[in-house]
Amino acid sequence: MNPKFSVLFLVEAADFLDGLDEKSRRKVIYNIDKSRYVNDPKLFKKLTNEIWEFRTKYQKNQYRLFAFWDKRDKRETLVVSTHGMIKKTGKVPKPEIEKAKKIMEDYFDDDGE
């Protein structure tokens, strides 16, 4: 079975993953990879019209990596991960969603779009 999309980790997302302990990082990456093949909102969920989140619950922590779609390449659909956080509240904090939107805007602006 072919994946539905590829994932690009921007610097802040990669730094977030690098800062996790080995087992947590493996679980987060496993879930991200799994979400490429299955449609499961427990793993990959839409937050707003543009912003999505990769979701992992592991050892009582809730890990979130924010992302958006880049469908400009007709051959490959790309999901771009902006940054991550360990969620401690019931709802995703609005500043995190706003940060993801700003990074998305910069991403497309830097590409000349």
Task: Please give the residue ranges for each predicted region.
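Basic, Lys/Arg-enriched alpha-helical interface segments
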Residues: 1-62, 71-79, 85-113
